[in-house]
Regions:
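Canonical positions in the second alpha-helix
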Residues: 15-16, 49-50, 83-84
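Phosphate-binding site of ATP-dependent enzymes
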Residues: 243-342, 346
Length: 412
């Protein structure tokens, strides 16, 4: 970490001073700064120095595991992760503060934060206790750190254990309110969603078949889908994956044997519904449910059927941004009263405290549901960027989350 010319010179001097003074927390601070700047080599040096001073530092080993992960040293990353949590599976994260802040216990697994919480639960506002359920040793005498509310970050239904005795033990010992029950999360699985939402008027939820791994080999997949009476075209994707990763639009059975799907516990085959608008574009709306109430998050408009905000080039067309702005400012008016009431009822039916939904609007005003689950990411946009208009609506979502968490935290 020797000083270099440029803006990092002071950071290097700080690291050298910390080494001389055997100050592990300062070295960890330096390592985090270097990691954020993608200076992984010097971050590793600072972390190794911190661990030489304090070999029990869970946070230093966590960051070192992250350094190894992003630099492709996967076995070393695994080893550091195991060392980090061998004796510490409840980790308290807090910033110095004179005022008492609500403390939120985050129920999660090692490396599995399905609900991104950086913006939802900022350290400036909350003390956080990360409880790593897959590392928990309930008989080792560990006491749960003080907390006011539990936020279940295990929002990916395909990754949940059924039943989960570790989660049950957490609830038994805690006695505090829980946000996002595992049972409600499990019901958002793609093949269960239609049953969960059955009876809601003015919505369409395409049929979904879940094909377990033993029947999902390329040579057997078409046969299994035929046995179930699935009709083409089908969207076939690996369980637990999002963002279009591994998805195939199959118009005939022969395509299935020619496609290589990423390894997964199962595949989902969803009946494809052409949702193209009259102008030839595909529209995907996203709303976030906070305390079961829908709040608009974005609208992506694309000439391709596989619509994602990051690939829709929204900033390239003023008309797209203006249409999105109208949705964000007046979602009820844009969707229509019938579809908006359906959206509200979906939020109630999901019974999740935090969740999201991706959907489109069909010509007759029916709401076409793509997915609804707790893994939806909410983040501010660049204040000077083309999508900065979203930030006031992002802030509305965050403020609603803050209010919900603090309301539950004060319950007796």
């Amino acid at each position: 970490v020797a000083p270099r010319d440029g803006p990092e010179d002071n950071l290097a001097k700080l690291a050298i001073s910390a080494m001389r003074n055997r100050d592990a927390p300062v070295l960890l601070f330096v390592a985090n700064q270097l990691f954020a700047r993608r200076d992984f080599k010097r971050a590793e040096i600072a972390l190794q120095a911190a661990l030489a001073i304090d070999p029990q530092s869970t946070m230093a080993r966590e960051v070192l595991a992250a350094v190894y992960q992003v630099t492709g040293r996967l076995e070393e990353a695994r080893q550091q992760s195991e060392l980090a949590y061998a004796s510490c599976w409840c980790i308290v994260d807090k910033l110095p503060s004179l005022a008492r802040k609500p403390s939120v216990l985050l129920a999660m697994n090692r490396g599995s934060e399905h609900i991104p919480s950086t913006h939802l639960l900022p350290l400036e506002r909350y003390d956080k206790v990360r409880c790593l359920l897959d590392c928990a040793k309930w008989d080792d005498g560990t006491e749960l750190p003080a907390h006011d509310v539990i936020f279940n970050l295990l929002g990916e239904p395909d990754s949940l254990v059924e039943p989960d005795p570790s989660f049950d033990e957490l609830l038994r010992r805690s006695g505090r309110p829980l946000l996002n029950t595992p049972r409600a999360v499990r019901e958002t699985r793609r093949d269960r969603l239609a049953a969960r939402l059955r009876g809601i008027e003015s919505i369409e939820v395409p049929e979904v078949h879940r094909i377990e791994a033993e029947h999902a080999a390329p040579a057997r997949l078409a046969e299994e889908l035929g046995r179930r009476g699935a009709r083409y075209p089908l969207l076939v994707r690996p369980a637990g994956m999002h963002g279009g990763r591994g998805v195939l639009l199959a118009t005939e059975p022969s395509q299935l044997s020619q496609h290589s799907f990423p390894a997964a516990s199962a595949l989902y085959a969803t009946a494809y519904r052409d949702y193209r608008s009259a102008d030839g574009y595909y529209r995907k709306y996203r709303a976030i449910f906070v305390d079961r109430k829908p709040l608009p998050y974005h609208l992506a408009i694309s000439p391709q059927w596989l619509v994602h905000y990051f690939s829709a080039e929204m900033g390239a067309a003023a008309a797209k941004l203006e249409e999105e702005r109208r949705f964000l400012e007046a979602p009820r008016a844009v969707l229509g009263e019938r579809a908006y009431r359906a959206l509200e009822e979906i939020g109630e039916r999901l019974a999740l405290d935090y969740a999201g939904i991706d959907f489109s609007l069909l010509p007759d005003g029916t709401l076409l549901v793509f997915e609804a689950n707790a893994t939806m990411l909410v983040h501010p946009e660049d204040a000077g960027g083309e999508t900065a208009h979203k930030n006031v609506h992002v802030e509305a979502i965050l403020q609603a989350v803050f209010a919900m968490v603090e309301r539950r935290a004060t319950r007796k």
